[in-house]
Design a protein with these regions (language model features):
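Conserved N-terminal/central alpha/beta ligand/cofactor-binding core
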Residues: 2-81, 85-87, 127, 150-156
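Extracytoplasmic Gram-positive cell-surface binding/anchoring modules and repeats
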Residues: 415-528, 539
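Glycine-rich, acidic and aromatic/proline-enriched surface loops and short helix-turn segments
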Residues: 34, 67, 81, 342-358, ...
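Stable alpha-helical elements in mature extracytoplasmic
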Residues: 24, 28, 57-61, 114-118, ...
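Flavin (FAD/FMN)-binding glycine-rich loop and adjacent Rossmann-like elements that form
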Residues: 76, 95-108, 112-406
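Long, well-structured alpha-helical subdomains associated
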Residues: 396-426
Length: 539
């Protein structure tokens, strides 16, 4: 199957980005809406606004791939080696189930594996598990590092076979109803009632995604560093736990008409082809994104280098281990992922995507979700194409060139909640937001956090000078709270080194909206054209 988490892993209820219709994520969602009949047809369960059948998503991805004449899709191989010369990656080796080998030589290689399997093979340094507070600077990180990753899940897709049907599976070995006694409350009609538990992942087509964290089928297994055969054997425990949970749903709860879907996964047990890994290896990149880059966006200039966006809270699944530190995560606004998190610190001609990007363990809880991973992958592919065209290492491709290429694909580089791709000024407002001259206002909001640009609001003089000062330090930060007028904006833009805007006398004393100010900035100062490095510092 094509699609990873969304298809082969069966995680077909997407988390987040409903209000960030960016790039490939939006293209994929448009295909789903056309296939099923609109937005409402996908909003079938309460965990997500976008639910679908894995085989439908797979067909969509194959259709999208077939539209690219230079793209060849090859199935049935797994990564077994990385080709390299010193610190430079030159391609990869793959092996099929019969032992057949395939060598792919490439100018640029991208690791899009779930667990970062190309990292050790390429000699790229990485981290695994929870980071120490002294290492990341995150106040919420534990005092000491450990190698514990989040719980994983083997997803089951159940199908309603109709009244009178009994699709109860054979009682699995080792089944004990007490194992799942806390997954629901039979006396409750609330969130954790039996029906509500199933409605969590209700999909179109009379199906249910079984990916339940509350004493359900999550499991903690130490498999990341195991060789392929040993990892596969160890993951059998996850498959067995899901089968026990399915039997529990059928036998104890009485949902006998719900059986493992016969039209999704061609596996011996009918479960997803691959486990849903929430965390694996995390590369040491040119930069490392931390939770502080989300909670305090403007403390570091990494926001200037955004290449993908997300709006999901920090979500860790660690219920299966009681020996780990308990962390109460703060509410966060939406965020962008910096370009430098995709580029290894030392390895050349190599880009990292998926969950193996250079992020802290804490913020991985937000960057790991399907829409963010898809958009980060789009950025990785864009960076790879530009590096190949330029015949240069990825780290030498200008940040702004990557961002411009993404904007041309209607992809977000800043997580603007209130400016959509069909806005005629979308690209301009994205660019100006990415300079920080006009700052976003973050808002934690339930499970769909926001960052507002407020294009139709005016802006105080002091707020404008604060943003302009970062671009042109010669501009002093003022405390003036009056609304910025066109004449005052023109004067400040000229003082910052821009062209003097031509302002009609009748408009001189009128306050500018943030939209009009952004257009004026782009026309007369063009701050986005000023290069930034991978740390977001102006060159």
């Amino acid at each position: 199957m094509l699609g990873g988490m969304l298809t082969a892993q069966g995680v077909c209820a997407t988390d987040g980005n409903f209000n960030l219709p960016s790039g490939l994520w939006n293209e994929f969602r448009d295909h789903l809406r056309k296939r099923y009949g609109g937005i409402g047809a996908l909003w079938t369960g309460w965990v997500s606004t976008t639910l679908f059948e894995p085989h439908v998503a797979d067909s969509i991805f194959h259709t999208m791939a077939a539209a690219e004449p230079t793209l060849e899709v090859v199935h049935g191989y797994r990564l077994t080696g990385i080709l390299r010369r010193g610190k430079r990656v030159t391609g990869a080796e793959f092996t099929d189930a019969r032992g057949g080998r395939m060598l792919v030589r490439a100018r640029i290689t991208v690791d899009a594996t779930d667990l970062g399997d190309a990292l050790p093979l390429s000699g790229t340094s990485y981290r695994l598990g929870m980071d120490a507070r002294a290492d990341t600077g995150e106040e919420l990180a534990p005092a000491e590092a450990n190698d514990a990753v989040q719980d994983l899940t083997v997803v089951a897709i159940l199908k309603d076979y109709g009244p009178g049907a009994d699709r109860t599976i054979e009682r699995p070995a080792g089944y004990d109803p007490a194992e799942f006694a806390g997954c629901y409350d039979l006396s409750s009609e609330g969130v954790h009632s039996a029906d509500r538990m199933l409605e969590y992942g209700r999909m179109p087509g009379g199906k249910y995604m079984i990916n339940w964290p509350k004493e359900g089928n999550d499991i903690n297994l130490d498999v990341v560093e195991l060789p392929h055969a040993e990892r596969t054997a160890a993951l059998e425990a996850a498959r067995q736990k899901t089968l026990r949970f399915v039997y529990h749903i059928q036998h104890e709860l009485g949902y006998r008409r719900l059986g493992i879907a016969d039209d999704e996964f061609d596996t011996p047990d009918g479960l997803a082809y691959l486990p849903y890994h929430r965390e694996g290896r995390r590369m040491d990149g040119v930069v490392r994104m931390t939770l502080d880059d989300v909670t305090d966006r403007y403390a570091r200039p990494l926001y200037r280098t955004g290449i993908s966006v997300g709006d999901y809270p920090v979500d860790h699944h660690r219920n299966c281990r009681t020996d780990l530190p308990k962390i109460l995560f703060p509410p966060v606004p939406s965020f962008s992922v910096p370009l430098g998190a995709l580029i290894p610190d030392r390895t050349e001609n190599f880009i990292v995507s998926d969950k193996a990007i250079s992020v802290s363990n804490l913020v991985n809880g937000s960057t790991r979700l399907q829409p963010v991973v898809m958009l980060t992958g789009q950025a990785a592919g864009t960076l790879a194409a530009l590096a190949a065209e330029r015949r240069c290492p990825p780290r030498e491709v200008p940040v702004r060139e990557v961002q411009e290429a993404l904007l041309a694909q209607k992809a977000y580089i800043a997580p603007l909640y209130d400016v959509k791709p069909d806005d005629p000024d979308f690209a301009t407002l994205q660019r100006i937001a990415a300079t920080g001259i006009l700052r976003m206002t973050g808002e934690p909001f339930h499970w769909a956090n926001r960052s507002w640009f407020y294009p139709e609001r005016t802006i105080p003089v002091g707020e404008f000078t604060r943003g302009l000062h970062d671009f042109a330090p010669r501009i002093p930060v003022r405390t003036d709270t009056t609304a910025l007028t066109a004449a005052r904006a023109a004067k400040l833009i000229a003082e910052a080194g821009g062209k003097a805007p031509r302002i009609r006398p009748a408009d001189a004393d009128r306050p500018l909206t943030r939209r009009k100010l952004a257009l004026l900035l782009e026309e007369c100062l063009d701050p986005f054209a000023r290069p930034v490095d991978l740390h977001g510092e102006y060159r």
